[in-house]
């Protein structure tokens, strides 16, 4: 989808006092690069796992929201943010695609993929005491009562992505997948043609 892409990593010393009080690791995607702030560790397998999980997820944001997004994302106001009802799509479906691509590449087995998705079921149930529509959570995620459920966007969003993918494959005899649907929507809307937030889901 892109002719070049740069991964920028910064590994922080876990002994830093500010990070011990409040661990704040993460990553941010851009059209042709992504930047990572991850804990430094001598555990090679742990480091590989963190990098693989995070880098694949951030790279796959080139699908959503970088190339398919609503007006709220296209014209994002950092001073007075208005969130999109599709945050679950941008983060959750991207998370599903990252798990799926790691399974398809052989980096994880089918059993490991099932375990990963099962953990997302338990994770979303743990974080969400009462049922909330994903569009409602996404739109209101900056409000205090919704902030504590932010992780659900990734966990349950990934489960919804898998559900949509399996349903599309079943109903169309494998002719349409979630990825092919997103590619079709990207042709219709695309990075410079954002959709109305209320029309997609």
Task: Give the positions of each predicted feature.
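Surface-exposed patches in mature extracellular/periplasmic domains of secreted proteins
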Residues: 1-7, 105-114, 172-182
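Acidic/His/Gly-enriched intrinsically disordered linker/tail segments
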Residues: 68-158, 189-193
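Amphipathic alpha-helical substructures
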Residues: 140-201
